[in-house]
Amino acid sequence: LDTYYGLKEGRISRADFAPTVYLFGAKAAPGYVRAKGIIKYINELAELVNGDADVNGLMQVVFVQNYNVSYAEKIIPAADVSEQISTAGTEASGTSNMKFMLNGAVTLGTLDGANIEIAEQAGAENEYIFGARADEIARLQKDGYDPNAVLAAEPRAKRVVESLVDGTFSDGGTGMFRELYVSLTEGASWHKPDHYFLMRDFIEYCDAGCQPGLSRRAGFRGKVCAQCGKRRRVFVRPYDSGICAGHLARVNAWDKAKRHGAKVPCRFFMPSASARAWCG
């Protein structure tokens, strides 16, 4: 939503922004009301963005229902950027980021879980790292943290959060969006306000997320190759260089297609697994 506003208002350069399709894939347990609220919000956002002729040539949003292995087998090999955005110190590890990395995807994420090892092996300069580190999160938990102070200081964050309750989107009268809003600003159940420190990382996350979409394609190729080199060091699979060549071929094809006016790349986001990918 912040990117949508940025494009609409000129804060994000349309000339530098790569046309992007955001694919969200998730599923919610029958009684998981908050997860259902997030999915509803994604679909409302899709309706807003896709129905706006002013921006839908630059960005679109699609929700993939019941995301599963069959979808992953198609999406993961195509990914250019894998988002792994769990709050630092909250996720022991995961395998999604490894699967994306094994297919040449650059990681955009926090220093958490296996992201740390990926950054160490491929080089932090070849990833898009943002957000508070685990020691800062621990300090905020100890000394106190006020997300409302962050919202007061960051109009962009406030505008996005307020969209939950200001009429921008409708939850059909279920109250799910207000529950999400309350969880961020007042606290819900046994959690304090913004339990996962989302507002602390919000602006850094949005700004980091725009970097892969800028017109620095040559630099991005180098980052992709670094992921492939990491695979050879860790797994000793000599044929991985062929995968890298195929991935770079997709990047080159994207460049050629873009020169001819094609609208090609897409991003994939799994909220339940804290992962998003930008597919070319």
Role assignments for model-derived ranges:
Residues 77-79, 85-256:
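Catalytic binding pocket for nucleotide-activated donors in carbohydrate/polymer assembly enzymes
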Residues 1-5, 43, 47, 80, ...:
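Amphipathic, well-packed alpha-helical segments that form the structural scaffold of globular domains
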Residues 272-274:
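Serine residues within intrinsically disordered or low-complexity segments
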Residues 60-62, 84-87:
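Short, flexible loop segments at the rims of nucleotide/cofactor-binding pockets, characterized by
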Residues 1-73:
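Long, K/E/R/D-enriched contiguous segments that form extended
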